[in-house]
Amino acid sequence: MEYSTLIARLKTASVSFENLEVQLADPDIANDPKKLESIARERSKLEPLVIDFNKLLDTDKEIEDSKNLLKENRNDKEMESLINEELIILEEFKNELIQKTTIALLPKDPRDERSVMLEIRAGAGGSEACIWAGDLARMYERYGQKVGWSVKSVSASESDMGGFKELVISVKGDSVYSQLKFEAGVHRVQRVPATESQGRVHTSTATVAVMPEADPVEVKIDPTDLEIGTARSGGAGGQNVNKVETAIDLLHKPTGIRVFCTQERSQLQNRERAMEILRAKLYEIQLKEANAKERSQRLSQVGTGDRSEKIRTYNFKDNRTTDHRLGSNFSLEPILAGQLDEVINACIAQEQKRMLEDFANEIN
């Protein structure tokens, strides 16, 4: 991006910030809690950018002053050397601010701030794939606990041999989707199963779908499109589950999506959870259809994130996790312990780099 274009956009952001501050001081807005909260949130988002913009302007002024001082001291070699050293430091700081503010101005995914439904399905590999699905669920649970999110299983289909054929996890918190969206895809594991007597390494897979939660307003569901059944639950509820049908079996007839929810204590709670999962699934379908063209253009760059795409391999023998999108290796044990910051931050950086390249191409 041309520097003049960057400055113009930053000035626009600064003006918007000032307008928001004026609105916050308006007594009429102060008497409207919802509007006040919305404006305060927007102001909070812009504040770091405006602070960096002011730093950039100050740095430009310091560079200009240093260059003028350099002209005045051309005959003083010692002073000239000191000024040149200062200019190098200032130019480096300016470049850092340019990079930081340019990234901050990139288009934001409006879904990034949402909580998510995380769906994990056992793939190829039989019972070992089911066990692997459970391992992934624990990995995300540990990561969620580490960053302060609320993580709860809302639907699960257990395997007779251990693990899960399928499970859905609700992850609630600030900007959950912005972090976990990079986990969508096929996760492959290479290890010796506990039941393997010959010590042979088996390869199994599990697919992860990351679905941003949808509001009822965004996804309209016709009640006539639903087929709802009940069953005795094997989930929470103590002895009550043996006597009362608390589980919900929900079928969305137009799409064939079926949701079986057992984890809550009452039929009403399970029904609400099932509807929440269904909305997230339908919202995901809407997003896929709406973004099909964009994803096809991005395929060769960062991948689609579809469930059919292998994104990561976990090799137990070599204690190595390979992220195929990044072309990078990470230590296996910390990853499985929920220490995902390094790999997620690398994915974010890769995405930002692609967006910067796209942005530069649009400008040119």
UniProtKB/Swiss-Prot annotation:
Q: Which residues carry this modification: N5-methylglutamine?
A: 239
GO CC entries: cytoplasm
- The reply on keyword Transcription is no
Q: How is it modified after translation?
A: Methylated by PrmC. Methylation increases the termination efficiency of RF1.
Top-rank taxon, per record: Bacteria
Q: Where does the protein end up? A: Cytoplasm
Primary subcellular site in the record, as a coarse category: cytoplasm
Keywords assigned: Cytoplasm, Methylation, Protein biosynthesis
GO MF annotation list: translation release factor activity, codon specific
Q: One Pfam match, by short name?
A: RF-1
Disulphide connectivity of cysteines: none
Among NCBIfam families, the record links this protein to:
prfA (TIGR00019), PRK00591.1 (NF001859)
What family classification does the UniProt entry report for this protein?
A: Belongs to the prokaryotic/mitochondrial release factor family.
**Family annotation (HAMAP family):** Rel_fac_1 (MF_00093)
Q: What does this protein do?
A: Peptide chain release factor 1 directs the termination of translation in response to the peptide chain termination codons UAG and UAA.
- Name of the protein: Peptide chain release factor 1
Organism, as annotated: Prochlorococcus marinus (strain MIT 9215)
